[in-house]
Every structure is written in C-alpha cells, then in structure tokens.
Amino acid sequence: MIAHLFTGLTNLGTAPVLLLLVFGMAVGMFVGMLPGLGVVLVLTLMLPFVYHMSVLETVSMMLATQSGVYFAASITAIVLNSPGAPESFPTTLDGFPMAKRGEAGKALAISATSTWMGGWIACIIFIGLIQLAGPLATVFHPPEYMAIIILAIVLIAQTGNIPLSKVYISGLLGLMLSFVGSDPVTGVERFTMRMPTLYSGIGVVPFALGVFAITQMVKMYGSQKAVATFDQAQLGKGFQAQVRAGIAETFKKWHHVARSAVIAMLLGLIPGIGGFTANFISYGVGQRVSKRRDEFGTGVPEGLMSAEGSSLSKEVGSIIPAVALGLPSGLGMVIFIAALTILGLEPGPTLLKGSPTLPYSMMWIMAIAGLLSCVLGLLLAPQLSRITGIKGPYMFPFIIALAVLGSFADVNTTMGIYLLVIFSILGVVVRDLGYSVAAAAIGLVLGGTFDDNVHLTYSLYGWNFVTRSPLADIFLLVAIYLIISAGRRWHKNKKAAMRQAAKHPLMEWVFDLVMAVFAVTYFIVGMGYPSQAGQIPVVVGILAAAASVYRLIIDFPVWLHSRHVDGSDLPQGGLAVPKPGAETEIEPVGTEGLAVAVITRMEHDDEPETKKDRRHQNIREFIGILWFAGTAAASLVLGFKIGVPLMTFVYAMVNKDLASLKKRVVFAVASTVVTGTLAYAFVSLFHLTFHGMI
C-alpha cells in the first residue's frame, strides 16, 4: 500500500498532468462562479477531448475541475447569497450573514482553509478505506437510502432559526415539486398539466437561481444598498487582519472541520447520495453538537466551517465507489465514469487489480487541488470581497443575465426561463414571510430519490425491512428522536408560539390559505394516479395540508391582533426588535421551541426604518421584478444575443440611481458589452436553434 501511495504521487510529476490540473482548477473556478452552469455541464463539455488524452491527464483535469467548481461556488454563496452550485446552499446560511456584517474577508478565509483542511483529512481516511471499498459500498440498499434521506430532511428542519412548522411546510413544498414529471417506476406523468416540457421534472437550477440569486438582487435593488460597506481601510490592513483571523480561527476550531470532513467522506461512499445531502447532513450535525447551535444561520464561523469542511471531502469519498464498483455518488461522477469508459477502463475490481496506483493518484490530485483552492482563495479574497461593496442597482443587470442564461442551459427549453420567473416571485414572497428556501431545496433535490427507494423498499421487503435492515433502523430511530425532541420543546413553548407576531400578518395568513388549497388540490390530483405512482405524493399532500392548516390557526389571531396594534416593528417569529445596533437579549416567542436565545448585535441593513421608506422599497422591489421579467421576455422574443444586451442597455440608460447622464452612458456601454459577450458566448457554446435563439 505504501509503495502504491508514493507511486501514485510520482506518476503526477509530468508537465502535461500538472498543467491540466491547473487548467481544470481554473476552468472549474470560473464555472463555479457562474450560477446555473454547474459541474455536470463543464465535465460533459470536456468529454470530447478525452479521446486524445492519457488516463492520468484525463483524471487530473476532470477531478481538478470538480474541486474548482465546488470551491468557487462557495465564493458566490458568501458574497452574493447565490451559490454557484446546489451543494453550496449550506454555505449561504452563515457565510452571507458574515459578509453582510463586513466580515467577507474572514468568511472567505474560513471557507478556503476549511476546504483544504477537510479535503486533506478525507485523503488520510481514503488511504485506509480504499482497501475496504467493495464491502463498504455494497452495504447500502433501498431501505438504507430511504432512511438516510428521511434523516437528511429532518436534520435540515433543525437548522436555522425558523419556526419548525414553516421549515416542514417548505420541505414538503420541495417534495411536492420533486414529484412533477414522469414517475420512474410506472411511467405515469404526474402533475405536468399535460405540458411535455415538464415530463422530465422541475430542475434545481431554475429553482435555486430564482429563490436565491434573483430574490437577493431584487432585495438589493429595492434597498439601493450593497451587501456590505467596504472602504479602502477595510480592504487594506484591516482586511488582511480579517483573513489572518479567519485562518487562525479555523485552525483553533479544527474539530468542526474534521467532523464535517469525516461525515461527508463516509456519505460520499454511498452511491447515489450526492454532495448536496452530504453537505446538509454535515451542517445539520455540526449545529446539533455545537455549543452555539442557536446561533447557526446568523453568521457564526462554526457554521461556515461545518458547511465547507465537507466541500472537498465528499468528492474524495465519492472516488471509492466510482473506481471500485463503478457506482457514482452524484452526476459529476457519472460523467467521470463515462470518461474512464471512453479510455477503455472498466471501473470495478478489474480496474483496482490492473491499475492499483490509479486510485492513489486520484487522491493526490484532490489533495493538490484542495491546496490550490486554499491558496487561490486567500490570494483573491481582497478582490472577491470588493463584490460585496457594489450596490444592488449596479449588479442587477449582470446577475439577471447570468440567471436567465443559466436557467435555459440547465433545462435547454424555454420552460427553464418560465420556471425561473415563477420561483423568483415565490422567493421574494417566502423570504418576507420567513419560510426556509433551504428546506424546499433539499426536498426538491432528494424527492425523486426518496420516491424511488420507497417503492423499491416496499416492493422488495414490504414492512419487513424494519427487521432486515439494522442500519436503516438506526437512521430512522435518530430521525424519530430528533422529531420527538423538537416536539417536546414546542410543547414547552406552545403558549408563546400561539402568541406569535409576524411582520406581514395579512400576507402570511393569505399565503397559508394558498398553501392549504394547493396541498389539498395536490392530494386530490394524486388520488387519481395508479397506487404506485400516487402513494407518496398523496401522503406528502396530506402532510402539507395539515401543516398549512396549523399555520392558518396560528396566524389568524395574529392577523386580528395586528389590526389593532401596530406590528410594523415586529419581525417574523415574534421576536422583539430593538433599535438597530443595540445589544439586547432576544426572547424566543414564536419559533415553536427551536428559537434562538442569544445576545447579539442586531443588523437591519435591508429593513427600512419608516412606513414611507418601506413603501418606497416595496415599489422598487416590484420594479426590479418587472425589469427581470422584461429581460426574460426579451430573451424569449428576440433571442439571447439581442434580448439580454438590449434590456441591459435600456436599464442602464433609464436608471436614476446613476446621477449624471455621462455615468449612465458609460455604465450602459460597459454593461451591454459584458452581457452581450456572455450571451454571444452562451449561444455559440450551446449551438441553440430553438425559436430563433441563435
């Protein structure tokens, strides 16, 4: 084993292999900072070049690209609240709040150091586990998959400071969306409204871009503010001090990174689980065991370490089932296995025997890529942090253009743009009402896999799986324990929950009513499908209807009370709000036993101080949505090459946020050139021929 370990390293000591490793990192980081493209797209585009490359050159380029994508995705998650890849959703929970406080440098340093440290810890574990690859990967069957997905959904419900019922409604909404499309077991088309473009389901990318990127841009456009305020002093000595503090804190609290790395590494061994689940479970476990669990989601370094410690380690773990059994843990590994097949290699025992040093070379590539990620992240941190100082109206056209192009790239039909518009409006609403888009995202991503494995489990074992699968029993017992403990805390604070106040009482009650009607309709439609195709959607619809009715009962008296009391200064969850900047103890009122009870400095950068300011911000947010919808419509009617730059130019010229005509002209020309170049490159790259989009 030791000989193979060192041989695997020396095999990388050729110029082509090292150059392709650096090239892959650079391409991956570029793609990772463009929401909507993703690792699958860039790896797929690399496949044609594989025919002219050696095995080590191919492996070096593709694995380094994956590492670059996932690291760069965390950068946009921190500075823009827009993860470049779905796997980086947990990073937004604490990374973006840190950036809003002016700690982007510290957050980026923690992210870079945690990524490197977690990846190297996983590489050490890899050395011991590669010998046990076969037995470890074959332990998981449909019951285990089903149980671990249930555990993942329950864990995400424990994260953040959002009322438990709202988290479950969000997760159930994500599950309901995941069942749209052709049922993989029976082939029945479910909830498609007879639209062929929905037969393949709802993509994660339009959802993520809508509820994260566009929603954030609309909010920033409405407030006319940047993510944070950065002056030259902060980007000088003060900024470097932030970076040093971030590195030092990561080493001081290394156990948070190590825990996430081990969890993600082990989850990476499970074929089909993917990095999304691994990252969320690592973050959820980190919160459960942390002394600052109640502060997770408010911008604590421990939360960011828990999220980023798993970023690279899960990719290291996914190598083992890919090369030992030919079983991918995610879509990225599907493309990687395809590349090995093109080169004449058959993943499995034959590969391990015929090329025993190859897995170790893969491990070294990931280790080197992790180190490069850390170094590049720290070197670029000052420049990347400047993004947070750009005001919303200036960033708006660029993010809108990327979102429209990215949504179409993911679905490859105009349905991607329609979905983007729908989810953007939904994102603005649910953000104001305090629902969890993260829970909805994990429901959307895991819903299909959960549905498949429930069917397989019941078909193979019936209810006997409880006695045949001890590992599944353990996962289910942990999930049940978490639900019961949350229920006990809710019962303890039940009266406080019933007195819950809301920032928008009437709007919240109307949303509850709409969700209840939607869930009941979903349940009724699901009843019309064959039993195998409709069982899980019907159960999910019933649960969503029950949770929505529960929210109706809670929110109705709150709305009645708000008609007599000015509740404009009460935020979602019924927390008493002090004046901005004041230090105070927050009393949990409406979070059903899962609230924060911490002493913190309140930040309300996005919240207007008066009713007049609030009305002005709401009007600007509505205008922002109209600009976004106009860009989407122009792209559909005129094509990307014309529609995107045209709307960018018009936006810049009529934008009153730019005081002088000269500034408007300069910004209009510059932004039009940038977005026009992006659109032209996009069209040329994908050779689109749909509805004249070339």
Model-predicted segments: where are they?
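Helix-loop-helix hairpins and the membrane-proximal interhelical loops
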Residues: 1-58, 134, 138, 189-300, ...
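Flexible extramembrane loops and terminal tails that flank transmembrane helices
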Residues: 491-637, 655-694
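Membrane-embedded alpha-helical modules
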Residues: 109-222, 342-481, 485-489
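Transmembrane alpha-helix interface/packing and boundary motifs in multi-pass membrane proteins
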Residues: 23-39, 69-81, 156-161, 261-273, ...
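Transmembrane helix boundary and interhelical junction motifs in multipass membrane proteins
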Residues: 33-45, 74, 84-89, 269-281, ...
